[in-house]
Amino acid sequence: MVNLGLSRVDDAVAAKHPGLGEYAACQSHAFMKGVFTFVTGTGMAFGLQMFIQRKFPYPLQWSLLVAVVAGSVVSYGVTRVESEKCNNLWLFLETGQLPKDRSTDQRS
């Protein structure tokens, strides 16, 4: 058994997919970047609202709600982009080729 983060993976699976450790590390980094973005984005949004609240007073609960929602949206975006990079890395490690452009835009 091979330890992969908190879970254990069979040796046969780890041998079949040699890039599994790199992919797991990439995903872990992507999720931690998302958590950091959530904390930072929420703090920045809350600080900005405290600055704006001097001119346009409104209840604190709305400041917290808007800050958390803004932090969540930005964090989701960052995590999605970073996870897509990890997916591309996984495809490259498995096939040896860069993934094709999967956009639906048909311009040539």
Swiss-Prot record:
<protein>
    <recommendedName>
        <fullName>Transmembrane protein 141</fullName>
    </recommendedName>
</protein>
<feature type="transmembrane region" description="Helical">
    <location>
        <begin position="32"/>
        <end position="52"/>
    </location>
</feature>
<dbReference type="InterPro" id="IPR026788">
    <property type="entry name" value="Tmem141"/>
</dbReference>
<comment type="similarity">
    <text>Belongs to the TMEM141 family.</text>
</comment>
<dbReference type="InterPro" id="IPR038259">
    <property type="entry name" value="Tmem141_sf"/>
</dbReference>
<feature type="transmembrane region" description="Helical">
    <location>
        <begin position="58"/>
        <end position="78"/>
    </location>
</feature>
<keyword id="KW-1133">Transmembrane helix</keyword>
<dbReference type="GO" id="GO:0005739">
    <property type="term" value="C:mitochondrion"/>
</dbReference>
<keyword id="KW-0812">Transmembrane</keyword>
<keyword id="KW-0472">Membrane</keyword>
<dbReference type="GO" id="GO:0016020">
    <property type="term" value="C:membrane"/>
</dbReference>
<dbReference type="Pfam" id="PF15110">
    <property type="entry name" value="TMEM141"/>
</dbReference>
